[in-house]
Swiss-Prot record:
Complex formation: Homodimer; disulfide-linked.
Gene source species: Mus musculus (Mouse)
Family: Belongs to the TGF-beta family.
GO molecular function: cytokine activity; growth factor activity
Localisation per UniProt entry: Secreted
Protein name: Bone morphogenetic protein 8B
Amino acid sequence: MAARPGLLWLLGLALCVLGGGHLSHPPHVFPQRRLGVREPRDMQREIREVLGLPGRPRSRAPVGAAQQPASAPLFMLDLYRAMTDDSGGGTPQPHLDRADLIMSFVNIVERDRTLGYQEPHWKEFHFDLTQIPAGEAVTAAEFRIYKEPSTHPLNTTLHISMFEVVQEHSNRESDLFFLDLQTLRSGDEGWLVLDITAASDRWLLNHHKDLGLRLYVETEDGHSIDPGLAGLLGRQAPRSRQPFMVGFFRANQSPVRAPRTARPLKKKQLNQINQLPHSNKHLGILDDGHGSHGREVCRRHELYVSFRDLGWLDSVIAPQGYSAYYCAGECIYPLNSCMNSTNHATMQALVHLMKPDIIPKVCCVPTELSAISLLYYDRNNNVILRRERNMVVQACGCH
């Protein structure tokens, strides 16, 4: 469970230097120095990698996002709330437990064969899949379209069928693959959810191509109905009711990154350290309330990561920040139960007393880590919900 503790500490150190982290009662004095010209940018890039944010955060929100929320971000925000709801009282989402990454897609092209054409009538949607990360396994996929009450035809049962457009042809009908069928009444209103998971195998093989989905509406007697007349809304609908697609993915385990090599401080930098005043907003505070020798046992300390201070609120939708915590303190023999130590740590601490020049001290490290949920925009303004593992320290111990 104690995975990537070095990255978590690096995150805390970088945030405090950049002004985006707040510490309470740090137990040790750490060196401080002024950053070089490129170091803040390099640190922000490393923080993005730790959090799983792809590339540089967008410089601004999508056009019109401030005027009226769009349907996909609203739905993803509901998913985020369900994922972070500890009470279990939120709306049940059957696909959430198996997904580490959830992506929404807004249709980029919409075509209709409507009343001006021969039957059957249909509505076609296209989605850009190029932002799907390589190596992800699709656990589920849904197409969501809003239906308004329809009086044409009046009080009739409608069959809504969805197909994937496998191959288009100039001289004949496109090759289609059946995905789902839903039955409802013409007067029904609300979001219609169609299962398109069966199309996911071709996504992973051809995610450099657009995904085409075609929707048909028929009555009980097989008569084709224009989807618009049946109350199904498309791109011209209000932003909060526009159709979109959602993919649920099981992310691969993050590879273990090589630890950063600490660069030795130059003489000029050491002089700068000595000249810097201590501030309770940064690393370098010795808490006077931890014993006459300034020593405190290994425990968890507060470290808050603020996306507002990092200037990322135009990219990160939720949360505005989170408590990452960090582990610090002494692991001094005898190790008691509150130090959450292992038998090996107890033995190492004992041998260290006898041979301090040979055997190092036992380290205070995270022993239990938990995930955070992060909701953000990607480069194409698609909304992403990611469950990032091993980001919050739940417990510390001597190991």
